[in-house]
């Protein structure tokens, strides 16, 4: 911990302005003239001139509290940015956490009596963000790439270490194998010369020269730079009565984010002694001022844990969602931002606010996390909607034309149901859908079957799609219900309603996306005639389909249907394909999907994941010479190019490589490949490389078995490439 001896204000873009007496936690000695520090009061980070600071000794507990405050400040800044952590913020958190561990280790056995910060909100959000951000950097990967300094390499400031900065932000400095002790500062040499001559100066103004770390060079690729301990500033021989002008490059000050040092120029010297005499305080005042900035003692945190109910997070979520209509995730973000801001603005409330944030993170199921006797509002509304729709389904008068004026009421119910299924807590929705063996879901399916109004049918289809995204068990229920049969019949009988036709194809693809077995009775409506109907739409289109969206949806539906047909001799899709005279457009769309490596049927992340629909379809196509002939010669050459490229690019142990090998084996077996031998040398080299692999994983063993079978059946494949 360091305390500011003098007030400082600068127009530098990354410099922190501070008053005399403020305390700082030094995070990095970026250069000889600028140190990266965190303000103990608020956790704000920026660059400060070391000549203005004096180190405070024996304040480990206050250091820990300042570190906790800085961690929360970074977390609050990320929450204000939507809960996403930048690379710089991740680096600061890594540094602060490591600094905290080093401080605790230096405290010795006495540290065991102190409540160590458990899995904090900052750590939780950091790990969650690293898992879902495309550009996130996980902690393990960070530590592998940037080794942290060990405790024996640290000086008196043993918790200090560097954050790797982008090379474009680091000022050019000399690189060397190891830091060496720098020569004494100019002012110190002058003072020593004067003392040697017997005319030592009486000016006791502090100089920032000797407080500079000897290892001031910065490396962008390593955290192992070693620092020597800094000694307190020594009196110099002379000092300018006023600080020199500060280099100016801008007026904006960036907080809570790692930035390059303000400039390579020297930092301003502290003001003259007569200008700051009134601003200096005693050491006891330093301790008292620092004590007022503490986050609270261990006893206060323990009391906060007892005072804050474990259900407070769920109660806040329920209140915000009911009164604002925000989605479940947006409610969580909003509460996190508000509580984090209160925690930063009112330090006395920090222990309580931390417990609120923890309860917000730990609450998985909103309906279970609420206090006993309190029911989630979304759960209540789902009960009402499901019950009323079931009553209307069972009402015999509902089917009378005279009661069609209830369409507005049913529409409101279905729109509210869709809104809840989309925005509410998924755990609440899953629990309500699974109640009484999916009674509510099956009631909606029966209602869809008897409802003939297109607008209501469209809303029901949207609700079915939202249910499919909740859980794989709901998809299994819909597969076994009458819904697939009703959708297939509706698609073939009513081709005039383009929007309903598109939604029907989409929902059918969702229902069949998991590759589960279909009841045998369904194939009466999902057999070869239905497959031919879909192929006709792909090849010829419909007059009302001006957007050309329907052919792509029908391709996806054919791929999803084929997942349910393991036996090639009973594959109704392949039977329809062999009877179709021309499938040029369909084959081109298959090639496009194969080239991209996309699986349009894999819509959800439910487990277990089905096979790759495009690869399975092509394997079935080339399982018989009758269907293998659907591709034109040029398309066939392109298909071989794509397959060979994927086999070469995929790494050993990848499950997809086995699928591509099986596809290539089927192509060689059912097409005249040995006549044209397209890409044969490349294929031979790839197969020999796979045979020579030393990996022993089950996937690699399966790959080698397929290659041996190919070379045994077609000897030319096992020959050395010419």
UniProtKB/Swiss-Prot annotation:
The keyword Nucleus applies. Residues 110-121, 206-240 have a biased composition (Low complexity). A motif (Nuclear localization signal) lies at residues 175-192. CDD domains: SH3_SPIN90. The modification Phosphothreonine is found at residue 181. It comes from the Eukaryota. One of its GO terms (cellular component) is intermediate filament. One of its GO terms (molecular function) is SH3 domain binding. The modification Phosphoserine is found at residues 120, 294. Residues 1-58 form the SH3 domain. Keywords: Chromosomal rearrangement, Nucleus, Phosphoprotein, Proto-oncogene, SH3 domain, SH3-binding. Signal peptide: none annotated. Associates with the intermediate filaments, vimentin and desmin. Binds the first and third SH3 domains of NCK. Binds the proline-rich domains of N-WASP through its SH3 domain. Similarly, binds diaphanous protein homolog 1 (DRF1). Binds the SH3 domains of GRB2 through its proline-rich domains. Interacts with Helicobacter pylori toxin vacA. Isoform 4 interacts with FHOD1. Interacts with FASLG. Interacts with TMIGD2. This is NCK-interacting protein with SH3 domain. It comes from Homo sapiens (Human).
């Amino acid at each position: 911990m360091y305390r500011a001896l003098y007030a400082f204000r600068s127009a530098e873009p990354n410099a922190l302005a501070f008053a005399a007496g403020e305390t700082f936690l030094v995070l990095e000695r970026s250069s000889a003239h600028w140190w990266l520090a965190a303000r103990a009061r608020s956790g704000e980070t920026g660059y400060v001139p070391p000549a203005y600071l004096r180190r405070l000794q024996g304040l480990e507990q206050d250091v820990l509290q300042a570190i906790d405050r800085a961690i929360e400040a970074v977390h609050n800044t990320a929450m204000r940015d939507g809960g996403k952590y930048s690379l710089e913020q991740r680096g600061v958190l890594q540094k602060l956490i490591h600094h905290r561990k080093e401080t605790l280790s230096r405290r010795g056995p006495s540290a065991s009596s102190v409540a160590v910060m458990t899995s904090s909100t900052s750590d939780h959000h950091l790990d969650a963000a690293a898992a879902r951000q495309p550009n996130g950097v996980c902690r393990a990967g960070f530590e592998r790439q940037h080794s942290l300094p060990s405790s024996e390499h640290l000086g008196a400031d043993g918790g200090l270490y560097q954050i790797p900065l982008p090379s474009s932000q680091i000022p050019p400095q000399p690189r060397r194998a190891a830091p060496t002790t720098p020569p004494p500062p100019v002012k110190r040499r002058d003072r020593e010369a004067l003392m040697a001559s017997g005319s030592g100066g009486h000016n006791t103004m502090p100089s920032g020269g000797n407080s500079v770390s000897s290892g001031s060079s910065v490396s962008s690729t390593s955290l192992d730079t070693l620092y020597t301990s800094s000694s307190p500033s020594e009196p110099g021989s002379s000092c300018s009565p006023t600080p020199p002008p500060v280099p100016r490059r801008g007026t904006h000050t960036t907080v809570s984010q790692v930035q390059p040092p303000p400039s390579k120029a020297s930092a301003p010297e502290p003001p003259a002694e007569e200008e700051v005499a009134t601003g200096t305080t005693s050491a006891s005042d330093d301790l008292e001022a620092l004590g007022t900035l503490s986050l609270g003692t261990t006893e206060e945190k323990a009391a906060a844990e007892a005072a804050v109910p474990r259900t407070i997070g769920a109660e806040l979520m329920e209140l915000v969602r009911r009164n604002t209509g925000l989605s479940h995730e947006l409610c969580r973000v909003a509460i996190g931002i508000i509580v984090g801001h209160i925690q930063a603005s009112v330090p006395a409330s920090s222990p309580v606010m931390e417990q609120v944030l923890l309860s917000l993170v730990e609450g998985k199921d909103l309906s279970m996390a609420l206090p006993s006797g309190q029911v989630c509002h979304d759960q209540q509304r789902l009960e009402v909607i499901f019950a009323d729709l079931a009553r209307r389904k069972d009402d015999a008068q509902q089917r009378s034309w005279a009661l069609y004026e209830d369409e507005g009421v049913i529409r409101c119910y279905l729109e509210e149901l869709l809104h809840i299924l989309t925005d509410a807590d998924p755990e609440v929705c899953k629990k309500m859908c699974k109640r009484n063996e999916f009674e509510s879901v099956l009631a909606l399916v029966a209602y869809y079957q008897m409802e003939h109004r297109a607008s209501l049918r469209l809303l029901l289809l949207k609700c079915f799609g939202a249910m499919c995204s909740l859980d794989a068990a709901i998809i299994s229920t819909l597969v076994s219900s009458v819904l697939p049969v009703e959708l297939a019949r509706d698609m073939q009988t009513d081709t005039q309603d383009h929007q309903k036709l598109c939604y029907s194809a989409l929902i059918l693809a969702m229902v069949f996306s998991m590759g589960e077995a279909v009841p045998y009775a369904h194939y009466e409506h999902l057999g070869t005639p239905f497959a031919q109907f879909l192929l006709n739409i792909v090849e010829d289109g419909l007059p009302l389909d001006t957007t050309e969206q329907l052919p792509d949806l029908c391709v996806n539906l054919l791929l999803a249907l084929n997942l349910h047909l393991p036996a090639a001799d009973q594959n109704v899709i392949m039977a329809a394909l062999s009877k179709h005279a021309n499938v040029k457009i369909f084959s081109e769309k298959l090639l496009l999907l194969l080239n991209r490596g996309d699986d349009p049927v894999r819509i959800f992340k439910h487990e277990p994941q089905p096979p790759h629909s495009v690869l399975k379809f092509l394997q079935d196509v080339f399982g018989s010479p009758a269907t293998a002939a659907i591709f034109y010669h040029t398309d066939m050459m392109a298909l071989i190019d794509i397959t060979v490229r994927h086999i070469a690019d995929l790494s050993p142990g990848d499950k997809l490589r086995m699928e591509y090998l099986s596809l290539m084996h089927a192509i060689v077996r059912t097409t005249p490949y040995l006549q044209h031998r397209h890409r044969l040398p490349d294929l031979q080299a790839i197969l020999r490389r796979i045979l020579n692999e030393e990996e022993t994983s089950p996937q690699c063993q399966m790959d080698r078995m397929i290659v041996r079978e190919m070379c045994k059946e077609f000897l030319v494949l096992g020959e050395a490439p010419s």
